[in-house]
Amino acid sequence: MNFLENEFFLLAVTFGIFFLAKLLQKKTGIMLLNPILLTIAILIVFLKMTHISYETYNEGGHLIEFWLKPAVVALGVPLYLQLETIKKQLLPIMLSQLAGCIVGVISVVLIAKLMGASDEIIYSLAPKSVTTPIAMEVTKSLGGIPSLTAAVVVCVGLLGGILGFKTMKLTHIGSPMAQGLSLGAAAHAVGTSTSMDISRKYGAFASLGLTLNGIFTALLTPTILRLLGLL
């Protein structure tokens, strides 16, 4: 094994690319230069040029998998800091997230159906707006294709992270709570990360949106599909 295939080297390359991409977006302010999108694109080119397989590259990923769970738990910190506001606005928060879940599932399912997608594809697209682990479990329970769901979830997150705040600016939605909840619910972890870059307040509401939408989607997607006659 040459040094290019060393798991620590590949991990360092990943961190380095992401750090530079983060700096680039911060300097330019261009949302299209999303650090996650840039990192993925550059890594694909790097792996192709060096003829390193994905399996070899992914060995380095096992070194940091442990930190995924603590990172999710850490999302509770900004939530706690906004606890009083959340308590006061609990009903509109819950209703908006419920509505967002229902509209999100129905819209993608109907569009896919109108375009002639098979039931298997529809089941794979239905949980598009929640984090990958939840989305894949929902897809498995429905009989969809988990790997397709994972790819769709990443694409949805990137689009939400790039276009989310721009879209809300055009519609004159200025409330940090509304923006954070919307982005967390629609663009899950990527949207939450983008919100955290703005402020802890935005990040707190995005974390809440991500969590509530994940719960509602897991619970309601099978029922929605049955009501639409697709399950």
Which positions does each model-derived feature cover?
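Structural signature of hydrophobic alpha-helical transmembrane segments
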Residues: 1-14, 59-73, 119-127, 147-155, ...
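Helical membrane-embedded segments and adjacent short helical loop/helix-boundary regions
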Residues: 2-80, 88-92, 96, 100
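Entry/N-cap segments of selected transmembrane alpha helices
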Residues: 10-13, 83-108, 150-159, 209-215
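Small-residue-rich segments of transmembrane alpha-helices in multi-pass membrane proteins
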Residues: 37-49, 69-74, 96-108, 126-136, ...
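Helix-loop-helix hairpins and the membrane-proximal interhelical loops
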Residues: 77-90, 113-114, 137-155, 170, ...
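Transmembrane alpha-helices that form the ion-translocation and gating core
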Residues: 95-135, 156-171
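Juxtamembrane boundary at the C-terminal end of a transmembrane helix
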Residues: 113, 220-231
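Alpha-helical membrane segments and immediately flanking helix-loop junctions
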Residues: 121-148, 154-155, 167-170, 174-212
